Amino acid sequence: MQVTVEDLSSVKKVLHIEAPAEDVKKALDSAYAELKKQAKVKGFRPGKAPRSVLERLYKSDVESDVAGEIISDAFRDAIMETKLKIVGPPEIEPPAIVSDEPYKFDATVEIFPELSDLNLKEIELSKNMYKATEQEIENQIAMIRKNMSSLETEEEDRPAKEEDFVLIDYEGVCPDGQPDELRFTENFTMELGTGRILKDFDAQIVGMKRDEEKDFEISFPEDYFNKELASKQVKFHVKLKEIRKQILPELDDEFAKDLGEYETLDQLKDSIRDHLQQGYDRRSEQELDEQVFQALLNRVEFEVPETLIKHETASMVSEAERALSYRDMTFEDTGATKEDMEERYREPAEQQVRRYLLLDKIVEQENVELPEEELENAFKGMAESLRQPLEIVKKYYASDAEQMNMLRQTLLQKEALKYVKNLNEIKEVELELQETEE
């Protein structure tokens, strides 16, 4: 077998492969010999049909099968000889076999880029030190109180105002028909001012009294989440049946106890503070990681195989599709197609692939190893997240070598990132209050 490599780019090659004529002849002879044993040809006893007859009847199928075998074997040998680290399957258009001649074919492949050694030092890094504020804690408690509140009918005969809860019947009519959402709806509870349907809708109800009925028109904006109502003028008829006031629980130790995990209000506040701080700490670390990536990407240039970009894009699109499915939605419900989403995610997918390739290079260059305790911690984290016994998680990975290798590689990449950060001085930046509020 002969092979030459033609460079299309640093990550795309064409292998010009030639299998010798004797290999072709041997493969054809073997194929016809096997066919002769099995073929049932009219006028001949089993195993007695001459090759000329078999060629007349089965030549196309035999040569197609033989070409596939030669390509598979020769391509495998070519990869071993050239030592190319290919990405994904090759692109091959099998030519026809010509008897007694070498079999020549081209295989277009993508390969992993070869990154030059990286300078991992002298990277200017700063870490934003976010801190959970008392106001954020109070906001969280306010949300919990609201979720634990009850509603009481307002006995006073007064107009409805913002932050009231109201019980209404309503019906909407569009010029071109009635979307299901606008058909007569009875005993609908809503909080005024939140814009559950539309803030303009709430504004029309503010000022109404119990048992009052009202007709009004609302224009839905172009970007309204329900595309059936976007840009439409809708006539509504509303009857206000009750005004209800929200009764919040007292903010004391009993309030904390009712949540089932705390004995005092201070314990609840401490728990909220810890939870918020954990989120801020993760944010700080993610921002720091991104600084490392950007610094290293500025120090090395390399092409990314299209195969890897497409694979990562598909993964991101699938994740977005899965997230929407949890809300019983599809891409079409958001006004986008799958092709739109693929285009949207292509650039972030390429950046993510670059990060993976950088981390793999660091692992190789610096001989980064995975401490066994990190693997154990990963198993424990998954067991806790999935609410499964630790041994079940370990057994799953022990039975699936591919999944285990993927997990180890992911953890190794984290170790590589940690390695780079440990090589460089990190300046901690305490942020002012207004910078942490969102």
UniProtKB/Swiss-Prot annotation:
This is Trigger factor. GO terms for molecular function: peptidyl-prolyl cis-trans isomerase activity; protein folding chaperone; ribosome binding. Disulfide bonds: none annotated. Residues 163-249 form the PPIase FKBP-type domain. It is an enzyme of class 5 (isomerase). Consists of 3 domains; the N-terminus binds the ribosome, the middle domain has PPIase activity, while the C-terminus has intrinsic chaperone activity on its own. One of its GO terms (biological process) is cell division. GO terms for cellular component: cytoplasm. InterPro entries: PPIase_dom_sf (IPR046357), PPIase_FKBP_dom (IPR001179), Trig_fac (IPR005215), Trigger_fac_C (IPR008880), Trigger_fac_C_sf (IPR037041), Trigger_fac_ribosome-bd_bac (IPR008881), Trigger_fac_ribosome-bd_sf (IPR036611), Trigger_fact/SurA_dom_sf (IPR027304). PANTHER family: TRIGGER FACTOR CHAPERONE AND PEPTIDYL-PROLYL CIS/TRANS ISOMERASE, TRIGGER FACTOR-LIKE PROTEIN TIG, CHLOROPLASTIC. Keywords: Cell cycle, Cell division, Chaperone, Cytoplasm, Isomerase, Rotamase. It catalyses: [protein]-peptidylproline (omega=180) = [protein]-peptidylproline (omega=0). Involved in protein export. Acts as a chaperone by maintaining the newly synthesized protein in an open conformation. Functions as a peptidyl-prolyl cis-trans isomerase. It comes from Desulfatibacillum aliphaticivorans. It is found in: Cytoplasm. Its EC number is 5.2.1.8. Belongs to the FKBP-type PPIase family. Tig subfamily.
